[in-house]
From Swiss-Prot:
Organism listed in the record: Nepeta racemosa (Catmint)
Enzyme class: oxidoreductase
EC number: 1.3.1.122
Gene name tied to this protein: ISY1
Family label: Belongs to the short-chain dehydrogenases/reductases (SDR) family.
Upper lineage: Eukaryota, Viridiplantae, Streptophyta, Embryophyta, Tracheophyta
Protein name listed in UniProt: (S)-8-oxocitronellyl enol synthase ISY1
Length: 388
């Protein structure tokens, strides 16, 4: 049994021999969203020598120039705006050797209707450029998420399914760009014989990417670093249900492993799967872990005194600039590394748990210890000098 089905924390931190002779690759990946929280893990894991059907040749696509924290990955980096069909056609259609597409990106708009339009267009642009031009294209992995079962953020109070959330639950009666993406995927794969697909639905992701719009661990690290700098208590910015109730999460490396499994295992084709760590935790316990990692006083949930990170952090830009200067950190702006709105949603609501039974029934036995996962990603945020 390979390491990615054994749940090894940090297994992807192996290094590739830079003097290794060039080889002919049977597997060629296109990662769309390579600087995202899962795309970054895919870029680290796919090129490893013991990855199934690997090592892989990897193309990585992102809108912005390549960041320094992504430079060690042995991939071909392509800066491309996938909302721009002309840019996509020019830069992606020449990649005729691609065998697998890992689509792990999204864009945020002010309404779900606009989310559907923009995110649908992005996916369609990529598939229109790749499917007709890649004769050996075998499989497309589409990453969506648990909002498939819960609804869009703007519809957060609609009637939802009763957990545990299973893959066979019907769609909610509301707009959801995940549904738009799935429909586009199902339509486009029909255009090429034997082309298969998989859909992956993680929960709250623990991982590393300063560019991610939904980076909970990185955001909490920034919050804790500011509390440490100011000598403040690490107050819990959430609700009682999140503090006392059971939560789960999805390790970014585990999600990457899950997608690779679905891409190469015949028994995982043409299916949608949940992907979470396989255990549960309480934020009141993880809050102590976070406080210990930064040497700050741990706060508690305060009944009737709920706070939001968006409010606590709204004037902290100059404080963050000072922390960056004094500690020689990578140059970042607070608004780039602090996803306060997302953290407030996660910690301001009870967690709706899913189940991994379907993945296990189809042969994926990967898991993570969520506490160890949390600590390992905090360590990585520190190692790349995002926080002191």
């Amino acid at each position: 049994m390979s390491w990615w089905w054994a749940g090894a924390i940090g297994a992807a931190k192996k290094r590739i021999d830079e003097d290794e002779a060039p080889r002919n690759y049977e597997s060629v990946a296109l990662i769309v969203g390579v600087t995202g929280i899962v795309g970054n893990s895919l870029a680290e894991i796919l090129p490893l020598s013991d990855t199934p059907c690997g090592p892989w040749k990897v193309y990585g696509v992102a809108r912005r120039p390549r960041p320094s924290w992504n430079e060690d990955h042995p991939i071909t980096y392509i800066s491309c705006d996938v909302l721009d069909s002309v840019d996509v056609e020019a830069k992606l259609s020449p990649l005729t050797d691609v065998t697998h597409i890992f689509y792990a990106t999204w864009t945020k708009r002010s309404t779900e209707k606009e989310n559907c339009e923009a995110n649908g267009k992005m996916l369609k642009n990529v598939l229109n450029a790749m499917i007709p031009n890649c004769p050996n294209l075998k499989h497309i992995c589409l990453q969506t998420g648990r909002k498939h079962y819960l609804g869009a953020f703007e519809d957060w109070k609609i009637k939802r399914h009763d957990p545990p959330l299973t893959e066979d639950l019907p769609r909610l009666d509301s707009q959801n760009f995940y549904y738009t993406q799935e429909d586009i995927l199902f339509e486009e794969v029909q255009k090429k014989e034997s082309l298969t697909w998989s859909v992956h639905r993680p929960g709250t992701i623990f991982g590393f990417s300063p560019y991610s719009m939904m980076n909970l661990v990185g955001t909490l690290c920034v919050y804790a670093a500011i509390c440490k700098h100011e000598g403040a208590v690490l107050r819990f910015p959430g609700c009682k249900g999140a503090w006392d109730g059971y939560s789960d999460c999805s390790d970014a490396d585990l999600i990457a492993e899950h997608q690779i499994w679905a891409a190469v295992d015949p028994y995982a084709k043409n299916e949608a799967f949940n992907v979470s760590n396989g255990d549960v935790f309480k934020w009141k316990h993880f809050w102590k872990v976070l406080a210990e990692q930064f040497g700050v006083e741990c706060g508690e949930y305060e009944e009737g005194k709920e706070v939001k990170l968006q409010d606590l952090m709204k004037d902290k830009g100059p404080v963050w600039d000072k922390i960056v200067r004094e500690n020689g950190l990578s140059t970042t702006k607070l608004e780039d590394v602090g996803n306060w709105w997302f953290s407030d949603i996660v910690l301001g609501n009870e967690c709706w748990l899913d189940t991994m039974n379907k993945s296990k029934e189809h042969g994926f036995l990967g898991f993570r210890n969520s506490k160890n996962s949390f600590i390992s990603w905090i360590d990585k945020v520190k190692a790349f000098k995002i926080v002191p």
